[in-house]
Amino acid sequence: SYMKKGQAIVDANHKAIDAGATAFHKFEVPADWATAEDKPHELSIEGHAAIVEQVKNLLEPINRMDGDSLPVSAFEKHVDGQWELGASQYEKRGVAVMVPHWDETKCIQCNQCSYVCPHATIRPIALTADEAAAAPENMRMIDAKGKGTDGLKFAIAVSPLDCMGCYNCVTACPKDALTMVPQEDELDQAPVWDYAVNKVSEKKELVAANVKGSQFAKPLLEFSGSCAGCAETSYARLITQVCGDRMFISNATGCSSIWGNPAATS
């Protein structure tokens, strides 16, 4: 099949194979690494007491691959299969190589980026004057547009450590206000995200049953275990914003069993 592209492409592939066999670099591993031990680390998190307990006692050990060391008693509170919701916000996996950077000078505040995000890692934020004044210095804001936004500031918050790097938001943006950049370039936005989701109030007066208005509602499905770019969790997340917490989702098993209820990472 490569021959359809020409002999030069075939030769380039052959050269790449040959280079791979000789271009490696030997790395000497220090002998003391064999007995190296991790320094004790006290996990410091805030939130609902039951979720914090679940994260500390189960989520963290399991994610460290220490699940086999957990006693049966650690699961006693979950013997009926129930887990506290919202634990996934504490994972902060940081798996995306590239994450979106928001250019406020191009943004038209359509909220389509948030609308298509499968993992709820990019969100529009409306801030009062007091909330804007207390925001981190590097939080970029513009005057909010639209009905009922007088006196409000607008921002797009991105969680660089929760983003999966799927490019959906960049593709959806009609004005090229989002560009993908290396994750490390956006790590300074993590405190901005924390402030936006934890300290800024939900503006219920802006919530409406349309693309823009729906994204001012807090998503009740976030940071799930679905694949990067998953359309299924985009729909499910949107339903939670439209219907709220008085709802059940009943469907056939499949991917939803995986992203919907991975043990300890609810």
Pin down the residues of each PLM region:
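Ferredoxin-type iron-sulfur electron-transfer modules and their immediate structural context
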Residues: 2-163, 170-266
